[in-house]
Amino acid sequence: MKITLRMMVLAVLTAMAMVLAACGGGGSSGGSTGGGSGSGPVTIEIGSKGEELAFDKTELTVSAGQTVTIRFKNNSAVQQHNWILVKGGEAEAANIANAGLSAGPAANYLPADKSNIIAESPLANGNETVEVTFTAPAAGTYLYICTVPGHYPLMQGKLVVN
């Protein structure tokens, strides 16, 4: 397999992100929120933490079958971000993020095969707000991530579906 510059950069960024995450404190970095107990439509506001590679909420709660609108605010002035809800665990989230690298910005940094993606926002440019509406899946815990190259290791959270 030929190792390209792009692959080397992704590997270095991923390794750096893992080191930074391992050095982080043990405290909570985000709250739980959501409109979860009802069955009516709910809008949840979430954003990025300024120029950090982090969501401002790391856990959201909704009810199975509920119509959910995620209003994602990119609070960075310069970076692009997105909000992607993944069907499957961490391995599937990593596969989606890695495939997004090859897909590029024209494809929202998402693979052509979206069978393991429950919901996806458009790319949000600096200080832009985007929305995605979907029906909450069956009860369980699902990961949401940003698939912009290098962001996935730090930009993830959990959607808890009751």
UniProtKB/Swiss-Prot annotation:
It comes from the Bacteria. InterPro entries: BlueCu_1, BlueCu_1_BS, Cu-binding_ET, Cupredoxin. The keyword Cell membrane applies. GO terms for cellular component: plasma membrane. Residues 1-22 form the signal peptide. Binds 1 copper ion per subunit. Transmembrane segments: none annotated. Its cofactor is Cu cation. Residues 42-162 form the Plastocyanin-like domain. Its main location: membrane. One of its GO terms (biological process) is photosynthetic electron transport chain. It is found in: Cell membrane. SUPFAM superfamilies: Cupredoxins. GO terms for molecular function: copper ion binding; electron transfer activity; oxidoreductase activity. A lipid is attached at residue 23 (N-palmitoyl cysteine). Gene3D superfamilies: Cupredoxins - blue copper proteins. The keyword Electron transport applies. Induction: Present in photosynthetically (anaerobically) but not dark (aerobic respiration) grown cells (at protein level). Apparently unprocessed protein is also present, its quantities increase with culture age. A later paper showed this protein to be present in both chemoheterotrophically (dark) and photoheterotrophically (light) grown cells, but with more protein present in dark grown cells. The second report is thought to be correct. It is a lipid-anchor. Cu cation binds at residues 81, 146, 151, 155. Monomer. Belongs to the multicopper oxidase family. Probably a soluble electron acceptor for the integral membrane protein electron transfer alternative complex III (ACIII). This is Auracyanin-A. It comes from Chloroflexus aurantiacus (strain ATCC 29366 / DSM 635 / J-10-fl). The lineage of its organism: Bacteria, Bacillati, Chloroflexota, Chloroflexia, Chloroflexales.
